[in-house]
C-alpha cells in the first residue's frame, strides 16, 4: 500500500475530533440516553473494533498490516535548508551509507589472515543484494613496474604472499598508500576492514533480506577468536533497530495492559477498576492503530511508544467514573441510577481533562520533526477516542452489570484502602494547618529547577536510542577507534561548469581544502579524487616520488581520469566532473561534537580560499540529523508555552474565570519545571524521546487538577468553608487521584523494559514526573486554594 502524504494525518485528526465532539455532546447534554440504551451505545465501539480489526489484520498471513520504519528520515526536519545540498550531493556521489566489517587481530599481514580475508570477501560478494566489497584483497593499486617499464593498474593483492619478504613488501606498499590506511587497514597493521555497498533497496527490503545477519555470520565464521569482529554502518544500525522495534511492539502493549489492570485491582481491590478502564483505553488504542494501518503509515522510532502511552493515559478517565459509581452504589443507588449519576458528575471534569491532554499532545505538532508531529496528532486523536470511550461505554456497561455485594473487596484491597485513607487524612491535616510552609517548599523547588535550566544538554544522536553497552554502540566505537569511523560527512564542491575538476588549478584548490580539513579536530581521514590522481601520475612518471601530485595540464588530468576505474571514484567526482566530493570520516558522536565538526569544516572551507564561483557545502545524514538538535532546542520552549497557553484558555473557559484558570495551571507547571530541572541536573539529555514529555505531562497532569477543582467548587457552592472543602476533596477524590497517578506511573515504567535506552529514560522520567504531579495536586493545589480562598 502506498502511504499518503503526512498532511493526511491532520485531516484524519480533524474528522475524528468532529465525531468525538458529537459523541461527547451526547454524554454531556443527553446522559440519560447512554444508560437508557446501553446495548446500542456499546454496539458502536464494538462495530468500530470489528472494522479496526479488519483494517489491521491481513487474513492471508495472517499478519498485521503494520509497517515499521527504523530509519532516521522521520527525524529530519523537512524544511531544513541543508536538505537540498544533501540531495544534490547524493545524486552526484551516491548515498552516504557506510557498512563496515572491521577485524582486529595480532597482525593483518600474514598468510592465514589474508587468505581468510580473501574467502570472506568472495563469500560476501556472492550474497544477493551486495554490490561491492572493498578490502585489502579486492582493492585496486596503481604502480610502475621497472622490469617491464609500464604502469600497472591491478589489485593490491593478486595472490596472497607466502614468503616473509614478499609479505613485508606488501605491508610496506599498503601502509604507505594515500588511501588504504584510511579506509581498509589501520596504520598499525592490526585491523582490516571490509567496506560493503549494496544494491538499491528500501530499509524494509534490507531487513527482510537477512543481509545483516548473513554478513556477521560469515565474518565470525571466517575470523574466529582470538580475532575480534566489529560491524557498524547505517544499514546495520537500522536492522538492529527494526528487531528491537518488533520486540517492543509485540510485548510492551500487552504488558502495559496487564500492569494497568493489575495496579487498578491492587490499589482498589476491585477487578472492575482493574479491567474496565484499561479495556476502554485498549479500544481507543486499537482504533488509532487501525487508522495508521488504513493510511499505510509505518510506526517509526518515535511513534513506537504510542501503544503503551495511550493505554496508560486513556485508562485514567475510567478510574474517576468507576470511583464515583462505587460511591453512589454505597449510598444505596441501583446500578442504572449510579451509572447515570457517575456520568453526570464526572462528564465535565473528564471532558476537561481529555481536552487538556489532547491540547498537550497536539502541541507537539508545532515541532519541526515529522516523527514528533505524527506522534502528537495520533496521540491526541487516541486520547480523544479514549475520553469518549470512557464517558459513553463505561457507564453503559455499568448500567448492565449488577452492583457488587457487601464483600466487594479482597483483603489486599481493604488493607490498601485503609492505608490510603490514613495517608490522605495526614495530607489533609497538613494542608489545612500549614499551607504557607507548603507553598514555600514548592517555591524553593521551582526556583532550584529554574536555575538548572541553562545546563540542559540537547542531543539528537540516533545512536543514543541504543544502550551504551549494546553491540551497536560498542562496535561503532571500536571502528572509530581502530579505523576512521563510520560517520561519513560530505564536503561537496560544485565548480559551476562541466569539466571543472579536470582543471589542475581546481584540483589544487581541492588539495588545499583537504589539507585544511585534515587539521580539523575529530577528523580521522579524508579522501578526494586527488588521492587517486596523484599516485597514478607518479606511476605514469616511472615511479618518480616528486611526480606524486596533480599534473600541470588539463590534458594530463583528463588522461588520468580516464584510466581510473569508475567504481573506485564514483563517490568522489560526478560523471561530467563538474562536482567533486571531499569525503570526511569522523568518529564524532553526540550533537555537540557533530555541531562543532560542522562549524570547524566551514571554517576550513573559508581558510582554504576556494576559487571564485566554486560552491562548497558540508552535508551528510549525520549533519542533517544533528540539525534536529538545534531545532529541538529552538522549538521546545515554544511548544511547551503553546501547550500551557492552550490549557490555560481551556481551564479559564471551563471555570469561567481567568484567576481560576491560572490557579489550576500552577500545580501543573511546577512539575514540568521540575522535569526540565532534572534534565539540567544531568539525569538525562533533552533528546527526541525525552522532548515529548514536557507538554504531554502538562496536559496529563491537569486531569486530576480538574477533578479536584470541580469537587472543591461544588462543596464551596454548598456552603462549606475552604478548609472543610479541601479536607473533604482530599478524603473523597484523593483515592482516584492516587490510583490514576500510580496507574500512569506504572504504565510509563513499562517502558523500562524497552530495548531502546532512550525509551527507558523516557519511562523513568515520565513516571517520576507523574508522581511529582500527584504530590502537587494533593499538597500545592490545596495550599493555593486555602491561601487565596478561591
What are these regions, as identified by a protein language model?
Residues 41, 56-107, 114, 161-185, ...:
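Solvent-exposed, non-transmembrane loop/terminal regulatory segments of multi-pass membrane proteins
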Residues 246-287, 355-363, 634-670, 674, ...:
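Internal alpha-helical transmembrane segments of multipass membrane proteins
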Residues 273-321, 658-710, 776:
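Hydrophobic transmembrane alpha-helices and their membrane-interface caps
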Residues 309-330, 350-357, 392-393, 696-715, ...:
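Short helical (or helix-break) motifs at transmembrane helix termini and adjacent helical loops
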Residues 328-355, 716-739:
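Helix-loop junctions and hydrophobic alpha-helical segments within the transmembrane domains
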Amino acid at each position: 500500500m502506498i502511504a499518503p502524504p503526512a498532511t493526511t494525518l491532520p485531516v484524519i485528526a480533524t474528522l475524528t475530533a468532529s465525531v468525538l465532539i458529537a459523541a461527547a455532546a451526547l454524554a454531556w447534554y443527553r446522559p440519560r440516553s447512554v444508560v437508557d440504551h446501553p446495548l446500542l451505545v456499546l454496539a458502536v465501539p464494538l462495530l468500530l473494533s470489528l472494522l479496526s480489526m479488519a483494517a489491521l489484520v491481513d487474513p492471508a498471513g495472517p499478519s498485521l498490516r503494520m509497517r515499521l520504519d527504523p530509519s532516521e528520515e522521520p527525524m529530519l526536519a523537512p524544511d531544513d535548508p541543508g536538505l537540498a545540498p544533501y540531495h544534490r550531493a547524493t545524486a552526484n556521489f551516491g548515498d552516504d551509507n557506510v557498512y563496515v566489517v572491521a577485524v582486529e587481530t595480532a597482525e593483518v599481514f600474514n598468510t592465514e589472515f589474508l587468505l581468510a580475508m580473501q574467502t570472506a570477501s568472495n563469500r560476501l560478494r556472492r550474497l544477493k543484494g551486495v554490490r561491492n566489497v572493498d578490502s585489502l584483497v579486492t582493492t585496486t593499486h596503481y604502480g610502475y613496474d621497472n622490469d617491464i617499464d609500464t604502469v600497472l593498474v591491478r589489485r593490491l593483492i593478486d595472490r596472497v604472499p607466502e614468503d616473509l619478504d614478499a609479505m613485508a613488501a606488501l605491508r610496506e606498499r599498503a601502509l604507505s598508500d594515500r588511501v588504504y590506511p584510511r579506509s581498509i587497514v589501520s596504520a598499525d597493521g592490526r585491523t582490516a576492514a571490509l567496506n560493503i555497498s549494496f544494491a538499491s533497496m528500501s530499509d524494509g527490503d534490507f531487513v527482510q533480506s537477512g543481509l545483516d545477519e548473513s554478513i556477521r555470520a560469515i565474518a565470525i565464521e571466517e575470523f574466529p577468536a582470538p580475532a575480534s569482529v566489529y560491524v557498524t554502518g547505517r544499514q546495520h544500525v537500522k536492522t538492529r533497530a527494526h528487531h528491537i522495534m518488533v520486540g517492543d511492539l509485540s510485548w510492551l502493549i500487552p504488558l502495559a495492559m496487564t500492569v494497568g489492570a493489575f495496579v487498578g485491582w491492587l490499589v482498589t481491590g476491585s477487578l472492575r477498576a482493574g479491567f474496565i478502564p484499561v479495556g476502554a483505553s485498549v479500544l481507543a488504542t486499537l482504533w488509532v492503530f487501525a487508522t495508521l494501518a488504513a493510511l499505510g503509515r509505518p510506526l517509526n522510532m518515535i511513534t513506537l511508544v504510542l501503544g503503551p502511552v495511550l493505554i496508560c493515559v486513556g485508562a485514567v478517565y475510567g478510574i474517576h467514573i468507576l470511583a464515583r459509581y462505587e460511591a453512589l452504589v454505597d449510598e444505596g443507588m441501583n446500578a442504572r441510577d449510579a451509572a447515570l449519576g457517575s456520568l453526570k458528575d464526572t462528564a465535565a471534569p473528564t471532558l476537561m481533562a481529555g481536552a487538556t491532554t489532547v491540547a498537550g499532545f497536539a502541541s507537539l505538532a508545532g515541532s519541526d520533526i515529522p516523527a514528533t508531529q505524527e506522534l502528537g496528532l495520533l496521540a491526541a486523536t487516541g486520547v480523544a477516542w479514549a475520553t469518549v470511550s470512557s464517558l459513553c461505554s463505561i457507564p453503559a456497561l455499568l448500567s448492565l452489570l449488577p452492583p457488587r455485594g457487601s464483600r466487594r473487596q479482597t483483603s489486599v484491597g481493604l488493607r490498601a484502602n485503609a492505608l490510603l485513607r490514613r495517608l490522605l487524612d495526614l495530607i489533609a491535616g497538613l494542608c489545612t494547618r500549614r499551607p504557607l510552609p507548603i507553598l514555600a517548599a514548592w517555591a524553593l523547588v521551582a526556583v532550584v529547577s529554574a536555575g538548572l535550566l541553562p545546563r540542559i544538554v540537547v542531543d539528537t544522536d540516533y545512536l543514543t536510542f541504543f544502550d551504551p553497552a549494546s553491540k551497536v554502540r560498542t562496535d561503532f566505537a571500536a571502528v572509530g577507534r581502530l579505523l576512521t569511523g563510520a560517520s561519513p560527512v560530505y564536503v561537496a564542491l560544485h565548480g559551476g561548469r562541466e569539466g571543472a575538476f579536470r582543471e589542475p588549478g581546481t584540483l589544487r584548490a581541492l588539495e588545499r581544502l583537504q589539507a585544511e580539513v585534515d587539521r580539523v579536530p575529530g577528523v580521522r581521514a579524508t579522501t578526494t579524487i586527488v588521492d587517486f590522481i596523484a599516485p597514478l601520475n607518479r606511476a605514469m612518471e616511472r615511479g618518480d616520488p616528486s611526480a606524486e601530485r596533480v599534473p600541470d595540464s588539463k590534458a594530463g588530468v583528463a588522461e588520468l581520469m580516464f584510466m581510473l576505474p569508475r567504481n573506485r571514484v564514483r563517490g568522489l567526482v560526478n560523471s561530467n566532473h563538474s562536482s567533486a566530493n571531499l569525503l570526511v570520516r569522523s568518529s564524532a558522536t553526540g550533537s555537540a561534537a557533530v555541531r562543532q565538526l560542522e562549524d570547524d569544516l566551514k571554517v576550513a572551507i573559508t581558510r582554504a580560499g576556494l576559487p571564485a564561483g566554486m560552491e562548497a557545502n558540508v552535508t551528510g545524514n549525520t549533519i542533517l540529523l544533528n540539525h534536529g538538535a538545534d531545532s529541538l532546542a529552538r522549538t521546545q520552549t515554544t511548544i511547551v508555552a503553546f501547550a500551557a497557553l492552550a490549557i490555560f484558555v481551556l481551564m479559564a473557559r471551563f471555570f469561567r474565570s481567568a484567576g481560576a484558570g491560572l490557579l489550576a495551571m500552577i500545580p501543573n507547571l511546577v512539575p514540568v519545571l521540575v522535569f526540565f530541572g532534572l534534565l539540567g541536573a544531568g539525569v538525562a539529555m533533552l533528546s527526541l524521546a525525552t522532548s515529548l514529555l514536557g507538554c504531554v505531562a502538562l496536559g496529563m497532569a491537569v486531569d486530576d487538577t480538574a477533578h479536584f477543582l470541580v469537587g472543591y467548587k461544588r462543596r464551596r457552592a454548598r456552603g462549606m468553608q475552604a478548609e472543610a472543602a479541601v479536607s473533604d476533596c482530599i478524603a473523597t477524590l484523593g483515592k482516584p487521584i492516587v490510583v490514576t497517578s500510580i496507574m500512569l506511573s506504572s504504565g510509563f515504567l513499562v517502558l523500562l523494559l524497552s530495548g531502546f535506552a532512550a525509551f527507558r529514560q523516557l519511562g523513568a522520567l515520565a513516571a517520576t514526573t507523574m508522581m511529582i504531579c500527584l504530590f502537587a495536586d494533593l499538597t500545592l493545589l490545596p495550599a493555593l486554594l486555602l491561601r487565596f480562598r478561591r
